[in-house]
Amino acid sequence: MASTTTITKLGKNKVLKARAGITALPPITQMAFGNGANGAPLEDDNALKNELLRKDLSGIEQVTETNFRYICTLTKEELADTTINELALCDEEGDLVMIRTCSDKNKDDDEEMTFEFDDKF
Protein backbone atom coordinates (compact mmCIF):
# COMPACT_ATOMS: atom_id res chain seq x y z
CA MET A 1 0.00 0.00 0.00
CA ALA A 2 1.34 3.40 -0.94
CA SER A 3 1.34 6.09 1.71
CA THR A 4 -1.54 8.58 1.35
CA THR A 5 -1.83 11.84 3.28
CA THR A 6 -5.00 13.92 3.57
CA ILE A 7 -5.48 17.34 5.14
CA THR A 8 -8.79 17.16 6.97
CA LYS A 9 -11.60 19.57 6.18
CA LEU A 10 -11.49 20.66 9.83
CA GLY A 11 -7.75 21.39 9.50
CA LYS A 12 -8.33 23.43 6.34
CA ASN A 13 -11.14 25.37 8.02
CA LYS A 14 -8.88 26.25 10.96
CA VAL A 15 -6.20 27.61 8.60
CA LEU A 16 -8.75 29.71 6.72
CA LYS A 17 -10.22 31.14 9.94
CA ALA A 18 -6.72 32.02 11.17
CA ARG A 19 -5.87 33.77 7.88
CA ALA A 20 -9.12 35.73 8.13
CA GLY A 21 -8.24 36.82 11.67
CA ILE A 22 -11.29 35.08 13.14
CA THR A 23 -9.37 32.71 15.43
CA ALA A 24 -5.80 31.79 16.27
CA LEU A 25 -4.44 28.60 14.71
CA PRO A 26 -3.87 25.98 17.42
CA PRO A 27 -0.41 24.38 17.17
CA ILE A 28 0.12 20.73 16.33
CA THR A 29 1.14 19.02 19.56
CA GLN A 30 0.56 15.27 19.17
CA MET A 31 0.67 12.34 16.80
CA ALA A 32 -1.97 9.61 16.84
CA PHE A 33 -1.26 6.00 15.86
CA GLY A 34 -3.71 3.35 14.71
CA ASN A 35 -4.08 0.07 12.86
CA GLY A 36 -7.44 0.32 11.11
CA ALA A 37 -6.42 1.75 7.73
CA ASN A 38 -8.41 0.41 4.80
CA GLY A 39 -7.54 2.82 2.00
CA ALA A 40 -7.01 6.54 1.69
CA PRO A 41 -8.23 8.75 4.54
CA LEU A 42 -11.16 11.07 3.83
CA GLU A 43 -11.03 14.83 4.37
CA ASP A 44 -14.20 14.58 6.50
CA ASP A 45 -12.47 12.23 8.98
CA ASN A 46 -11.65 13.53 12.46
CA ALA A 47 -10.69 10.15 13.89
CA LEU A 48 -8.49 7.27 12.89
CA LYS A 49 -10.30 4.06 11.97
CA ASN A 50 -8.81 2.37 15.05
CA GLU A 51 -6.75 4.73 17.22
CA LEU A 52 -4.34 2.94 19.56
CA LEU A 53 -2.29 5.77 21.06
CA ARG A 54 -1.99 9.55 21.02
CA LYS A 55 1.39 10.90 22.09
CA ASP A 56 3.08 14.29 22.45
CA LEU A 57 5.53 15.10 19.67
CA SER A 58 9.24 14.41 20.24
CA GLY A 59 10.29 17.30 18.02
CA ILE A 60 9.56 19.66 15.16
CA GLU A 61 12.04 20.58 12.42
CA GLN A 62 11.81 23.22 9.74
CA VAL A 63 13.01 21.42 6.61
CA THR A 64 12.47 24.29 4.14
CA GLU A 65 10.55 27.57 4.11
CA THR A 66 7.41 25.64 3.16
CA ASN A 67 7.94 22.33 4.97
CA PHE A 68 7.86 21.44 8.66
CA ARG A 69 8.54 17.91 9.93
CA TYR A 70 6.76 16.58 13.02
CA ILE A 71 8.57 13.77 14.83
CA CYS A 72 7.29 11.28 17.39
CA THR A 73 9.24 8.39 18.90
CA LEU A 74 7.56 5.37 20.42
CA THR A 75 9.46 3.77 23.30
CA LYS A 76 10.12 0.03 23.42
CA GLU A 77 7.06 -0.44 25.61
CA GLU A 78 4.63 1.68 23.59
CA LEU A 79 2.55 -0.31 21.09
CA ALA A 80 4.87 -3.31 21.51
CA ASP A 81 4.11 -6.18 19.12
CA THR A 82 1.56 -4.06 17.28
CA THR A 83 1.03 -3.23 13.61
CA ILE A 84 0.66 0.47 12.76
CA ASN A 85 -0.81 1.60 9.43
CA GLU A 86 -2.46 4.96 10.13
CA LEU A 87 -1.10 8.17 11.66
CA ALA A 88 -2.48 11.63 12.32
CA LEU A 89 -1.24 15.03 13.40
CA CYS A 90 -3.40 16.42 16.22
CA ASP A 91 -3.65 20.04 17.30
CA GLU A 92 -3.83 21.23 20.90
CA GLU A 93 -7.64 21.17 20.70
CA GLY A 94 -7.48 17.42 20.02
CA ASP A 95 -8.58 17.65 16.38
CA LEU A 96 -6.92 15.65 13.62
CA VAL A 97 -5.62 18.08 11.01
CA MET A 98 -3.76 15.61 8.78
CA ILE A 99 -4.17 11.85 8.42
CA ARG A 100 -1.80 9.43 6.71
CA THR A 101 -2.36 5.78 5.87
CA CYS A 102 0.58 3.56 4.98
CA SER A 103 1.72 -0.02 4.65
CA ASP A 104 1.87 -2.05 7.85
CA LYS A 105 4.72 -1.11 10.19
CA ASN A 106 5.35 -3.87 12.73
CA LYS A 107 6.51 -2.48 16.09
CA ASP A 108 8.57 -5.04 18.00
CA ASP A 109 8.88 -4.99 21.79
CA ASP A 110 12.67 -4.59 21.78
CA GLU A 111 13.04 -1.38 19.79
CA GLU A 112 12.08 2.25 19.67
CA MET A 113 10.39 3.45 16.49
CA THR A 114 10.42 7.02 15.19
CA PHE A 115 7.78 8.41 12.85
CA GLU A 116 8.17 11.57 10.77
CA PHE A 117 5.25 13.45 9.24
CA ASP A 118 5.90 16.32 6.82
CA ASP A 119 3.54 19.28 6.49
CA LYS A 120 4.36 21.13 3.27
CA PHE A 121 2.91 23.71 0.92
Report residues per predicted region.
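Small cysteine-rich, disulfide-bonded extracellular modules of the LU/uPAR three-finger superfamily
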Residues: 1-84, 92-121
